[in-house]
């Protein structure tokens, strides 16, 4: 792959244009760039595997499958992707979800096979350190074709990659990644709904959370999982409401990483009375008489309005009637 030298910059947020033999891509922010490069590297690993005799043998074995739709996953996975119902495509091609709604699939054994394939695909994505719910259709095509061919022929895929992204620093990150590998979307939904209820989130907020098409099972699980174990004393309902405003994948990715940053701060403080306050669409931690502002430095921009917002916040919180004695800024990212 190659990254264009022509980088559009809005404050600290860079927008990159990436060219590769697998297509052209755009990444907003450095962290999204790492995610995209990881996906391109994963596609390349899968492409190399598809050129091996092992894959050719797997394709022959998969021809014994009773599902015509599965054959298309290997021959022309792009057509399979574009033909999906819209409400299924938005959760990013988990195969159990994708095929269980096909009218002609009723046989229990077939459903069992599809469930096993879904698990195989999640394991493949896990080994490559990519998001199985990614909106990258090229990645999905490769995961589908290689995943089905090797699953149906009972072959392991000898590929793996180390992660590039830098925001995996919380104690819960490894556990949550394992959860995403081991659980179906339905199981993740039940777990996340249970945790949100136990955290005291309003029913209407929970419903909006699960109804947001940009909050895939991955983003839902990372946000809920990072918050659940922290014991925050207030503001969670408002914070989930803020996450619900996500109107793009970039928004969902941003809130996932902000939540990780909040969790990282809480893991490194002994404070027990911490709450979240939403101020001008900023999530701010209130720690006794301190405010802590978590910022992803390469995922924001500075403007005159931003400066006024921060100045007003500082003036009102520290001025007459304010009880704040210190404001801290907790930063992640690079410029």
Annotate each predicted stretch with a short phrase:
Residues 16-18, 77, 125, 294-295, ...:
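Long, contiguous hydrophobic alpha-helical segments, chiefly transmembrane helices and signal peptides
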Residues 88-106, 164-203:
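Membrane-engaging insertion elements
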Residues 281-293:
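Active-site beta-strand-loop-beta-strand hairpin of nuclease catalytic cores
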């Amino acid at each position: 792959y190659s990254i264009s030298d022509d980088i559009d910059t809005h404050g600290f947020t860079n927008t990159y244009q990436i060219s590769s033999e697998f297509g052209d891509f755009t990444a907003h922010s450095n962290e999204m760039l790492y995610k995209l490069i990881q996906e391109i590297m994963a596609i390349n690993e899968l492409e190399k595997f598809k050129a091996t005799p092992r894959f050719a043998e797997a394709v022959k074995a998969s021809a014994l499958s009773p599902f015509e739709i599965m054959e298309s996953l290997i021959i022309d996975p792009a057509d399979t992707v574009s033909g999906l119902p819209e409400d299924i495509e938005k959760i990013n091609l988990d195969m159990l979800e994708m095929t269980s709604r096909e009218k002609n699939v009723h046989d229990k054994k077939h459903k069992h096979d599809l469930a096993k394939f879904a698990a195989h695909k999640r394991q493949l994505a896990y080994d490559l350190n990519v998001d199985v719910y990614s909106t990258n259709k090229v990645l999905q095509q490769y995961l589908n074709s290689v995943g089905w061919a090797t699953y149906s022929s009972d072959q392991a895929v000898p590929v793996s990659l180390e992660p590039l992204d830098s925001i995996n620093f919380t104690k819960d990150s490894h556990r949550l990644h394992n959860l995403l590998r081991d659980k179906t979307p339905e199981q993740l939904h039940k777990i996340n709904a249970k945790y949100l209820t136990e955290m005291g989130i309003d029913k209407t907020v929970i419903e909006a959370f699960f109804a947001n098409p940009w909050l895939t099972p991955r983003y839902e699980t990372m946000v809920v999982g990072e918050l659940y174990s922290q014991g925050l004393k207030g503001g969670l309902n408002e914070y989930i409401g803020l996450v619900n405003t996500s109107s793009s994948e970039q928004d969902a990715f941003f809130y996932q990483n902000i939540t990780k940053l909040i969790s990282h701060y809480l893991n490194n403080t002994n404070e027990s009375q911490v709450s979240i306050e939403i101020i001008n669409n900023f999530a701010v931690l209130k720690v006794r008489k301190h405010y802590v502002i978590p910022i992803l430095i390469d995922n924001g921009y500075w403007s005159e309005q931003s400066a006024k917002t921060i100045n007003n916040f500082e003036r009102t919180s520290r001025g007459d009637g304010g009880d704040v004695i210190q404001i801290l800024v907790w930063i992640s990212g690079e410029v």
